[in-house]
Amino acid sequence: MQPNDFQGFIQAGGHLFIFLITGGLTLYFATERLWAEFIVSLFIRGTSASFFKGIAAHELGHGTVFKTKALNSLFLRFYSIISWHNHHEYAMSHAYHHRYTLHLEGDREVVLPLEILMGRPFYLLQIFTLSITGGPVTSGIIPIMKGTFQTAFGGKGASVISEEWSNALYTNHAKERPHAIKWARLITLFHTCVLLLALYSGLWALPLVLSTQQFTANWLKHFVGLPMHCGLRSDVADFRKCVRSITLDPISEFLYWRMNWHLEHHMFAGGPCYNLKKLHNAVAHDMPKLRTFFGAWKEMLEIKQQQQLDPNYEFDTPVPSASKVINGKNAALTESIGDLAPARLK
């Protein structure tokens, strides 16, 4: 269950290959004024690249994709800067999310109840075109850019989740703040250079390819990402009751960096994403019934109906009683969150 450089290249390098191919095609179609092809290519690119922020950068932030730490670091910085992702801020937040999952006092990265916005036409329009305001598990161009600029100029931007959560993190870990500010400035500098290069070269589509792809066509990220915690229990110590795993088709699972095995990821956060299915099979006897994609959404919509009658309702996932004691070797795996937490949080 240890990281492997070859499998790491398949995941991180494969996603990068898609990024390069779709980027080249999008620019080509734009320069040749093949508008139908351009729109389709831009949509496919956004669908793929929307998984960079908080997914690709998230898994690389755990330091478990590659055995070679320098490769983890290199790909983390690439995926972060291209997707407006401040991995320093996120590392603080996500360390708490893993240690205090859905306990409001210690985890405000995910706060229940998560809203299902399927009945809002403007939100649906955004996730299939350009996400302006964002929403649960999707990136809005206004809040992300605003939060990045605020952090870059010394403020406490809400580029992770909320300004309140950012303030709480920085209050307790002030020494991490300079790293986040420096990275926000690098993000700002990079995307400013992209814009200036586009203006100088006349390649007007360049910012759409290198700067706004994170906010384009967030539909798949929304549909596969929202089920991970939505409608489940808060303030419980059993991951099986507050995290949901679902089965996906191979393409979606690849783009989502296998995070559909989300329960296994929370239980074994120090394990590589490409081994999560194996981990599931190893402990399947102790796990709740595995949901399908459509089954999870059906369950979520039923929970939403219950919450309209009782706002405090949370679904209590039926689970088998634990049947095996974790040995010392596996205990180390369950306790680890990889290299995610900054040194002062470990």
Role assignments for model-derived ranges:
Residues F78, E164-Y170, C242-R258:
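Cytosolic juxtamembrane regulatory segments of multi-pass membrane proteins
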Residues T68-A70, L186, E253-F254:
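Short helix-capping and inter-helix turn/linker motifs at the boundaries of alpha-helical repeat units
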Residues I55-H62, Y90-L102, V224-G231, L255-G271:
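Histidine-centered catalytic micro-motifs
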Residues G46-A57, N86-Y90, V209-A237:
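Transmembrane alpha-helical segments that form the membrane-embedded catalytic/substrate-channel core
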Residues M1-T47, I82-P207, C273-K346:
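Non-catalytic, topology-defining segments of multipass membrane proteins
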Residues I55-L74, L102-P113:
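Aspartate-rich (DDxxD/NDxxD/DxxxD) Mg2+/diphosphate-binding motifs
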Residues F66-S73, M92-Y96, Y123-T133, R233-R244, ...:
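Juxtamembrane/interfacial segments around transmembrane helices
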Residues T22, G61, V65-F66, V236, ...:
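Active-site-flanking alpha-helical
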